[in-house]
Protein backbone atom coordinates (compact mmCIF):
# COMPACT_ATOMS: atom_id res chain seq x y z
CA UNK A 1 0.00 0.00 0.00
CA UNK A 2 1.38 3.44 -0.89
CA UNK A 3 1.20 5.89 2.03
CA UNK A 4 -1.13 5.77 5.01
CA UNK A 5 -3.77 7.90 6.67
CA UNK A 6 -1.20 9.35 9.06
CA UNK A 7 1.15 10.63 6.34
CA UNK A 8 0.26 14.22 5.40
CA UNK A 9 1.88 17.64 5.27
CA UNK A 10 1.15 19.76 8.39
CA UNK A 11 -1.91 22.02 8.16
CA UNK A 12 -3.63 20.11 5.36
CA UNK A 13 -7.00 18.33 5.66
CA UNK A 14 -6.66 14.88 7.20
CA UNK A 15 -9.75 13.38 5.56
CA UNK A 16 -10.93 13.66 1.97
CA UNK A 17 -14.41 12.42 1.05
CA UNK A 18 -15.93 11.67 -2.35
CA UNK A 19 -19.73 11.49 -2.18
CA UNK A 20 -21.67 9.96 -5.06
CA UNK A 21 -24.63 12.31 -4.63
CA UNK A 22 -25.39 15.69 -3.07
CA UNK A 23 -27.75 14.56 -0.29
CA UNK A 24 -25.18 12.03 0.86
CA UNK A 25 -22.52 14.74 0.85
CA UNK A 26 -24.47 16.97 3.25
CA UNK A 27 -25.29 13.91 5.35
CA UNK A 28 -21.62 13.00 5.70
CA UNK A 29 -20.49 16.59 6.26
CA UNK A 30 -23.14 16.87 8.98
CA UNK A 31 -21.72 13.84 10.81
CA UNK A 32 -18.14 15.06 10.51
CA UNK A 33 -19.05 18.52 11.85
CA UNK A 34 -20.86 16.98 14.81
CA UNK A 35 -17.79 14.87 15.49
CA UNK A 36 -15.76 18.06 15.89
CA UNK A 37 -14.16 18.60 12.46
CA UNK A 38 -14.03 21.80 10.45
CA UNK A 39 -15.50 20.76 7.11
CA UNK A 40 -15.54 22.28 3.65
CA UNK A 41 -18.40 20.89 1.54
CA UNK A 42 -17.88 21.64 -2.13
CA UNK A 43 -20.17 20.92 -5.05
CA UNK A 44 -17.98 19.14 -7.62
CA UNK A 45 -14.19 19.35 -7.70
CA UNK A 46 -12.73 22.80 -6.93
CA UNK A 47 -10.07 24.42 -9.13
CA UNK A 48 -6.60 22.94 -8.69
CA UNK A 49 -5.20 26.09 -7.10
CA UNK A 50 -8.01 26.55 -4.57
CA UNK A 51 -6.76 26.23 -1.00
CA UNK A 52 -8.90 24.95 1.86
CA UNK A 53 -8.72 25.69 5.57
CA UNK A 54 -10.44 22.66 7.04
CA UNK A 55 -9.90 19.34 8.77
CA UNK A 56 -11.98 17.48 6.19
CA UNK A 57 -13.14 18.15 2.65
CA UNK A 58 -16.29 16.58 1.20
CA UNK A 59 -16.54 16.69 -2.60
CA UNK A 60 -20.13 16.22 -3.74
CA UNK A 61 -20.54 14.52 -7.11
CA UNK A 62 -23.64 13.52 -9.05
CA UNK A 63 -22.14 10.18 -10.04
CA UNK A 64 -24.43 7.51 -8.61
CA UNK A 65 -26.52 6.84 -11.71
CA UNK A 66 -24.39 8.15 -14.57
CA UNK A 67 -22.47 5.76 -16.82
CA UNK A 68 -19.84 3.86 -14.84
CA UNK A 69 -17.04 5.31 -16.96
CA UNK A 70 -18.21 8.84 -16.13
CA UNK A 71 -18.49 8.02 -12.42
CA UNK A 72 -14.94 6.66 -12.47
CA UNK A 73 -13.60 9.74 -14.26
CA UNK A 74 -15.32 12.13 -11.83
CA UNK A 75 -14.20 10.16 -8.77
CA UNK A 76 -10.58 9.97 -9.92
CA UNK A 77 -10.59 13.73 -10.55
CA UNK A 78 -11.85 14.28 -7.00
CA UNK A 79 -9.33 11.84 -5.53
CA UNK A 80 -6.40 13.49 -7.29
CA UNK A 81 -7.48 16.93 -6.08
CA UNK A 82 -7.81 15.65 -2.50
CA UNK A 83 -4.43 13.94 -2.54
CA UNK A 84 -2.82 17.03 -4.07
CA UNK A 85 -4.16 18.97 -1.10
CA UNK A 86 -2.59 16.55 1.34
CA UNK A 87 -5.41 14.36 2.66
CA UNK A 88 -4.17 11.16 4.27
CA UNK A 89 -7.37 9.11 4.12
CA UNK A 90 -9.85 8.90 1.22
CA UNK A 91 -13.49 8.07 2.01
CA UNK A 92 -15.80 7.03 -0.86
CA UNK A 93 -19.26 7.81 0.48
CA UNK A 94 -22.06 5.60 -0.87
CA UNK A 95 -25.75 5.31 -0.09
CA UNK A 96 -26.83 3.36 2.99
CA UNK A 97 -29.01 1.23 0.72
CA UNK A 98 -26.03 0.43 -1.56
CA UNK A 99 -27.83 1.99 -4.55
CA UNK A 100 -26.29 0.48 -7.69
CA UNK A 101 -26.84 -1.92 -10.56
CA UNK A 102 -24.86 -4.83 -11.98
CA UNK A 103 -22.93 -2.26 -14.05
CA UNK A 104 -21.99 -0.17 -11.00
CA UNK A 105 -21.28 2.36 -9.99
CA UNK A 106 -19.96 1.30 -6.60
CA UNK A 107 -17.70 -1.51 -7.78
CA UNK A 108 -16.04 0.30 -10.70
CA UNK A 109 -15.36 3.39 -8.58
CA UNK A 110 -13.88 1.34 -5.72
CA UNK A 111 -11.57 -0.48 -8.13
CA UNK A 112 -10.48 2.74 -9.84
CA UNK A 113 -9.70 4.42 -6.51
CA UNK A 114 -7.83 1.36 -5.24
CA UNK A 115 -5.73 1.40 -8.41
CA UNK A 116 -5.12 5.14 -8.12
CA UNK A 117 -4.05 4.86 -4.48
CA UNK A 118 -2.11 1.62 -4.97
CA UNK A 119 -4.30 0.11 -2.26
CA UNK A 120 -4.19 -3.67 -1.90
CA UNK A 121 -7.07 -4.05 0.56
CA UNK A 122 -10.09 -2.00 1.57
CA UNK A 123 -13.48 -2.30 3.26
CA UNK A 124 -17.04 -1.38 2.32
CA UNK A 125 -20.07 -1.02 4.57
CA UNK A 126 -23.32 0.87 4.03
CA UNK A 127 -24.35 0.38 7.68
CA UNK A 128 -26.05 3.35 9.35
CA UNK A 129 -27.84 1.91 12.41
CA UNK A 130 -29.18 5.32 13.50
CA UNK A 131 -31.22 5.33 10.29
CA UNK A 132 -32.14 1.64 10.44
CA UNK A 133 -29.49 0.34 8.01
CA UNK A 134 -27.68 -2.68 9.43
CA UNK A 135 -25.50 -5.39 7.89
CA UNK A 136 -25.37 -8.93 9.28
CA UNK A 137 -23.83 -11.98 7.61
CA UNK A 138 -23.14 -9.64 4.70
CA UNK A 139 -26.85 -8.95 4.17
CA UNK A 140 -28.23 -5.41 4.29
CA UNK A 141 -31.41 -4.70 6.24
CA UNK A 142 -33.65 -1.62 6.11
CA UNK A 143 -35.23 -1.65 9.54
CA UNK A 144 -36.17 -5.28 10.08
CA UNK A 145 -36.62 -5.95 6.35
CA UNK A 146 -34.07 -7.34 3.92
CA UNK A 147 -33.02 -4.73 1.37
CA UNK A 148 -34.39 -6.93 -1.42
CA UNK A 149 -37.82 -6.96 0.24
CA UNK A 150 -37.90 -3.25 1.08
CA UNK A 151 -39.21 -0.38 -1.01
CA UNK A 152 -35.77 -0.19 -2.64
CA UNK A 153 -36.69 -3.14 -4.84
CA UNK A 154 -38.93 -0.68 -6.72
CA UNK A 155 -36.34 2.10 -7.11
CA UNK A 156 -36.77 3.46 -10.67
CA UNK A 157 -33.03 3.82 -11.35
CA UNK A 158 -31.28 1.36 -9.02
CA UNK A 159 -33.74 -1.39 -8.03
CA UNK A 160 -32.12 -3.41 -5.23
CA UNK A 161 -33.28 -7.02 -5.55
CA UNK A 162 -30.43 -8.76 -3.72
CA UNK A 163 -29.50 -8.06 -0.08
CA UNK A 164 -26.28 -10.12 -0.17
CA UNK A 165 -23.67 -7.36 -0.48
CA UNK A 166 -20.76 -9.73 -1.03
CA UNK A 167 -22.55 -11.08 -4.09
CA UNK A 168 -23.77 -7.66 -5.24
CA UNK A 169 -20.34 -6.06 -5.06
CA UNK A 170 -18.51 -9.04 -6.58
CA UNK A 171 -20.80 -8.84 -9.62
CA UNK A 172 -19.78 -5.20 -10.16
CA UNK A 173 -16.03 -5.84 -10.18
CA UNK A 174 -13.93 -6.29 -13.30
CA UNK A 175 -13.16 -10.05 -13.62
CA UNK A 176 -9.92 -9.19 -15.38
CA UNK A 177 -8.55 -7.52 -12.26
CA UNK A 178 -9.18 -10.64 -10.18
CA UNK A 179 -10.30 -8.87 -7.00
CA UNK A 180 -12.38 -10.94 -4.59
CA UNK A 181 -14.94 -9.72 -2.06
CA UNK A 182 -15.02 -11.15 1.46
CA UNK A 183 -16.68 -10.44 4.80
CA UNK A 184 -15.70 -9.24 8.26
CA UNK A 185 -18.34 -11.05 10.30
CA UNK A 186 -20.38 -9.57 13.12
CA UNK A 187 -18.80 -11.66 15.87
CA UNK A 188 -15.44 -10.14 14.96
CA UNK A 189 -16.78 -6.58 14.79
CA UNK A 190 -18.43 -6.99 18.21
CA UNK A 191 -15.08 -7.79 19.87
CA UNK A 192 -12.65 -4.92 19.35
CA UNK A 193 -10.82 -2.74 16.85
CA UNK A 194 -7.81 -5.01 17.19
CA UNK A 195 -9.93 -8.07 16.31
CA UNK A 196 -11.20 -6.25 13.21
CA UNK A 197 -7.66 -5.32 12.13
CA UNK A 198 -6.53 -8.91 12.64
CA UNK A 199 -9.43 -10.22 10.54
CA UNK A 200 -8.69 -7.73 7.77
CA UNK A 201 -5.07 -8.89 7.71
CA UNK A 202 -6.24 -12.52 7.51
CA UNK A 203 -8.61 -11.78 4.64
CA UNK A 204 -5.91 -9.95 2.70
CA UNK A 205 -3.56 -12.91 3.21
CA UNK A 206 -6.33 -15.16 1.82
CA UNK A 207 -6.48 -13.10 -1.37
CA UNK A 208 -9.48 -10.93 -0.49
CA UNK A 209 -9.21 -7.36 -1.80
CA UNK A 210 -12.44 -5.81 -0.51
CA UNK A 211 -14.33 -6.81 2.64
CA UNK A 212 -17.95 -6.05 3.39
CA UNK A 213 -18.18 -5.30 7.13
CA UNK A 214 -21.12 -6.30 9.34
CA UNK A 215 -22.45 -3.67 11.76
CA UNK A 216 -25.59 -3.66 13.91
CA UNK A 217 -24.95 -0.70 16.19
CA UNK A 218 -23.18 2.63 16.52
CA UNK A 219 -20.68 0.89 18.81
CA UNK A 220 -19.83 -1.52 15.98
CA UNK A 221 -19.06 1.42 13.69
CA UNK A 222 -16.97 3.06 16.41
CA UNK A 223 -14.83 -0.08 16.67
CA UNK A 224 -14.55 -0.23 12.88
CA UNK A 225 -13.58 3.44 12.72
CA UNK A 226 -10.77 2.83 15.21
CA UNK A 227 -9.62 -0.21 13.22
CA UNK A 228 -9.37 1.96 10.09
CA UNK A 229 -7.09 4.52 11.74
CA UNK A 230 -4.19 3.85 9.35
CA UNK A 231 -6.21 2.84 6.28
CA UNK A 232 -5.61 4.87 3.15
CA UNK A 233 -9.00 4.18 1.55
CA UNK A 234 -12.46 3.06 2.66
CA UNK A 235 -16.00 2.88 1.29
CA UNK A 236 -19.00 3.50 3.54
CA UNK A 237 -22.27 5.30 4.03
CA UNK A 238 -22.27 8.46 6.13
CA UNK A 239 -22.96 6.26 9.16
CA UNK A 240 -19.22 5.74 9.64
CA UNK A 241 -18.49 9.46 9.40
CA UNK A 242 -18.60 10.38 13.07
CA UNK A 243 -16.56 7.29 14.07
CA UNK A 244 -13.40 8.42 12.24
CA UNK A 245 -12.56 11.92 13.57
CA UNK A 246 -11.50 10.64 17.00
CA UNK A 247 -8.58 8.94 15.23
CA UNK A 248 -7.09 12.44 14.86
CA UNK A 249 -8.10 13.59 18.35
CA UNK A 250 -11.30 15.46 17.47
CA UNK A 251 -14.13 15.52 20.02
CA UNK A 252 -17.89 15.85 19.36
CA UNK A 253 -19.41 19.32 19.09
CA UNK A 254 -22.99 20.59 18.80
CA UNK A 255 -22.00 24.20 18.11
CA UNK A 256 -23.45 24.81 14.68
CA UNK A 257 -25.18 27.97 13.54
CA UNK A 258 -26.28 29.63 10.33
CA UNK A 259 -27.28 33.17 9.36
CA UNK A 260 -30.93 34.04 10.17
CA UNK A 261 -33.47 32.62 7.72
CA UNK A 262 -35.51 35.01 5.63
CA UNK A 263 -38.04 34.82 2.84
CA UNK A 264 -40.52 32.25 1.64
CA UNK A 265 -40.45 28.49 2.21
CA UNK A 266 -40.73 25.67 -0.33
CA UNK A 267 -40.26 21.92 -0.67
CA UNK A 268 -39.37 20.04 -3.86
CA UNK A 269 -39.83 16.27 -3.58
CA UNK A 270 -38.58 14.17 -6.47
CA UNK A 271 -37.93 10.90 -4.67
CA UNK A 272 -40.28 7.94 -5.12
CA UNK A 273 -39.07 6.22 -1.94
CA UNK A 274 -41.45 4.81 0.65
CA UNK A 275 -40.21 7.36 3.20
CA UNK A 276 -40.74 10.39 0.96
CA UNK A 277 -44.16 9.10 -0.13
CA UNK A 278 -45.16 8.96 3.54
CA UNK A 279 -43.79 12.47 4.17
CA UNK A 280 -45.74 13.91 1.23
CA UNK A 281 -48.94 12.21 2.36
CA UNK A 282 -48.47 13.45 5.94
CA UNK A 283 -47.87 17.03 4.78
CA UNK A 284 -51.03 16.99 2.64
CA UNK A 285 -53.11 15.21 5.28
CA UNK A 286 -52.26 17.89 7.83
CA UNK A 287 -53.42 20.70 5.55
CA UNK A 288 -50.23 21.62 3.69
CA UNK A 289 -50.48 23.28 0.28
CA UNK A 290 -49.15 20.88 -2.36
CA UNK A 291 -49.00 20.53 -6.14
CA UNK A 292 -48.28 17.26 -7.96
CA UNK A 293 -46.11 17.05 -11.07
CA UNK A 294 -47.29 14.58 -13.70
CA UNK A 295 -44.48 13.28 -15.95
CA UNK A 296 -46.92 12.73 -18.81
CA UNK A 297 -48.17 16.33 -18.70
CA UNK A 298 -44.61 17.57 -18.41
CA UNK A 299 -43.63 15.55 -21.46
CA UNK A 300 -46.53 17.04 -23.43
CA UNK A 301 -45.68 20.69 -22.62
CA UNK A 302 -43.12 21.29 -19.89
CA UNK A 303 -43.14 25.09 -20.15
CA UNK A 304 -46.91 25.20 -19.76
CA UNK A 305 -46.79 22.89 -16.72
CA UNK A 306 -44.04 24.90 -15.03
CA UNK A 307 -46.00 28.11 -15.63
CA UNK A 308 -49.06 26.45 -14.09
CA UNK A 309 -47.12 25.50 -10.96
CA UNK A 310 -45.68 29.00 -10.62
CA UNK A 311 -49.11 30.60 -11.00
CA UNK A 312 -50.40 28.32 -8.22
CA UNK A 313 -47.43 29.21 -5.99
CA UNK A 314 -47.83 32.94 -6.59
CA UNK A 315 -51.51 32.73 -5.64
CA UNK A 316 -50.71 30.80 -2.45
CA UNK A 317 -48.02 33.27 -1.38
CA UNK A 318 -50.26 36.27 -2.11
CA UNK A 319 -52.73 34.72 0.32
CA UNK A 320 -50.12 33.91 2.99
CA UNK A 321 -46.48 34.86 2.38
CA UNK A 322 -45.05 32.57 5.09
CA UNK A 323 -46.86 29.47 3.81
CA UNK A 324 -44.56 26.50 3.03
CA UNK A 325 -45.41 25.05 -0.39
CA UNK A 326 -44.73 21.50 -1.59
CA UNK A 327 -44.24 20.47 -5.22
CA UNK A 328 -43.84 16.74 -5.65
CA UNK A 329 -43.37 14.13 -8.35
CA UNK A 330 -43.40 11.41 -5.70
CA UNK A 331 -45.63 8.49 -6.66
CA UNK A 332 -46.46 4.94 -5.67
CA UNK A 333 -44.73 2.12 -7.64
CA UNK A 334 -47.77 1.65 -9.90
CA UNK A 335 -47.74 5.31 -10.91
CA UNK A 336 -44.02 5.24 -11.57
CA UNK A 337 -44.41 2.11 -13.70
CA UNK A 338 -47.16 3.75 -15.77
CA UNK A 339 -44.97 6.77 -16.55
CA UNK A 340 -42.04 4.51 -17.41
CA UNK A 341 -44.23 2.45 -19.74
CA UNK A 342 -45.20 5.50 -21.79
CA UNK A 343 -42.04 7.61 -21.61
CA UNK A 344 -39.28 5.15 -20.78
CA UNK A 345 -37.24 5.23 -17.58
CA UNK A 346 -34.62 7.72 -18.79
CA UNK A 347 -37.05 10.26 -20.30
CA UNK A 348 -39.45 10.03 -17.37
CA UNK A 349 -36.68 10.84 -14.89
CA UNK A 350 -35.09 13.51 -17.07
CA UNK A 351 -38.32 15.43 -17.62
CA UNK A 352 -39.03 15.55 -13.88
CA UNK A 353 -35.46 16.66 -13.12
CA UNK A 354 -35.73 19.40 -15.75
CA UNK A 355 -38.94 20.67 -14.17
CA UNK A 356 -37.57 20.51 -10.62
CA UNK A 357 -34.41 22.43 -11.54
CA UNK A 358 -36.46 25.13 -13.28
CA UNK A 359 -38.79 25.39 -10.28
CA UNK A 360 -35.88 25.61 -7.83
CA UNK A 361 -34.46 28.61 -9.69
CA UNK A 362 -37.86 30.25 -10.15
CA UNK A 363 -38.83 29.79 -6.50
CA UNK A 364 -35.57 31.25 -5.18
CA UNK A 365 -35.85 34.20 -7.57
CA UNK A 366 -39.38 34.70 -6.19
CA UNK A 367 -37.97 35.11 -2.70
CA UNK A 368 -37.77 31.59 -1.31
CA UNK A 369 -35.06 31.75 1.34
CA UNK A 370 -35.52 28.27 2.84
CA UNK A 371 -35.73 25.31 0.46
CA UNK A 372 -36.04 21.58 1.19
CA UNK A 373 -35.17 19.19 -1.64
CA UNK A 374 -35.97 15.47 -1.31
CA UNK A 375 -34.25 12.84 -3.43
CA UNK A 376 -30.61 12.47 -4.42
CA UNK A 377 -31.10 13.00 -8.16
CA UNK A 378 -33.44 15.94 -7.56
CA UNK A 379 -31.03 17.51 -5.08
CA UNK A 380 -28.14 17.25 -7.50
CA UNK A 381 -29.94 18.92 -10.37
CA UNK A 382 -31.38 21.67 -8.14
CA UNK A 383 -28.02 22.52 -6.57
CA UNK A 384 -26.50 22.77 -10.03
CA UNK A 385 -29.36 24.97 -11.24
CA UNK A 386 -28.86 27.29 -8.26
CA UNK A 387 -25.11 27.49 -9.00
CA UNK A 388 -24.19 26.51 -5.45
CA UNK A 389 -20.47 25.85 -5.04
CA UNK A 390 -20.01 25.36 -1.28
CA UNK A 391 -22.25 24.84 1.75
CA UNK A 392 -22.03 25.62 5.45
CA UNK A 393 -23.51 22.92 7.71
CA UNK A 394 -26.14 23.94 10.27
CA UNK A 395 -28.70 22.34 12.62
CA UNK A 396 -29.90 18.80 12.01
CA UNK A 397 -33.58 18.21 11.22
CA UNK A 398 -33.44 14.41 11.40
CA UNK A 399 -30.45 12.04 11.44
CA UNK A 400 -28.50 12.58 8.24
CA UNK A 401 -30.36 15.73 7.14
CA UNK A 402 -29.01 19.12 8.21
CA UNK A 403 -29.96 22.60 7.17
CA UNK A 404 -27.18 24.20 5.15
CA UNK A 405 -26.42 27.74 4.04
CA UNK A 406 -25.05 28.54 0.60
CA UNK A 407 -24.38 31.43 -1.70
CA UNK A 408 -26.58 31.34 -4.81
CA UNK A 409 -26.78 33.77 -7.70
CA UNK A 410 -30.52 33.13 -7.85
CA UNK A 411 -31.14 34.28 -4.25
CA UNK A 412 -32.47 37.81 -3.82
CA UNK A 413 -29.93 38.56 -1.05
CA UNK A 414 -27.24 36.20 -2.32
CA UNK A 415 -27.78 33.52 0.33
CA UNK A 416 -30.08 30.51 0.70
CA UNK A 417 -30.92 28.03 3.45
CA UNK A 418 -31.23 24.59 1.87
CA UNK A 419 -31.79 21.07 3.18
CA UNK A 420 -31.01 18.11 0.92
CA UNK A 421 -32.86 15.00 2.08
CA UNK A 422 -32.03 11.52 0.86
CA UNK A 423 -35.25 9.94 -0.34
CA UNK A 424 -35.14 7.21 2.29
CA UNK A 425 -34.35 9.49 5.25
CA UNK A 426 -36.50 11.39 7.69
CA UNK A 427 -39.49 10.77 9.92
CA UNK A 428 -43.05 10.86 8.48
CA UNK A 429 -43.50 14.44 9.74
CA UNK A 430 -40.23 15.66 8.20
CA UNK A 431 -41.78 18.22 5.83
CA UNK A 432 -44.12 19.47 8.55
CA UNK A 433 -41.36 20.18 11.06
CA UNK A 434 -38.35 21.04 8.88
CA UNK A 435 -38.75 24.82 8.91
CA UNK A 436 -38.88 24.98 12.71
CA UNK A 437 -35.17 24.06 12.73
CA UNK A 438 -34.03 27.12 10.77
CA UNK A 439 -34.78 30.47 12.40
Predicted region positions:
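Short glycine-rich or small-residue beta-strand-to-loop segments that form or flank ligand, phosphate
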Residues: 14-19, 57-65, 88-99, 214, ...
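Conserved, well-structured core segments that form the ligand-binding/active-site neighborhood
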Residues: 143-312
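Short acidic, glycine/serine/threonine-rich loops at helix termini
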Residues: 28-30, 102-106, 133-141, 222-227, ...
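C-terminal structural cap/anchor segments
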Residues: 313-374
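Conserved, well-ordered active-site substructure
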Residues: 368-369, 377-426, 430
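General beta-strand structural signal in soluble alpha/beta enzymes
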Residues: 17, 40-42, 90-94, 122-126, ...
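N-terminal basic/disordered segments at the start of proteins
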Residues: 8-52, 73-75, 125-130
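Cap/lid and interdomain-hinge subdomains that line or gate substrate/regulatory clefts
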Residues: 11-14, 71, 79-221, 437-439
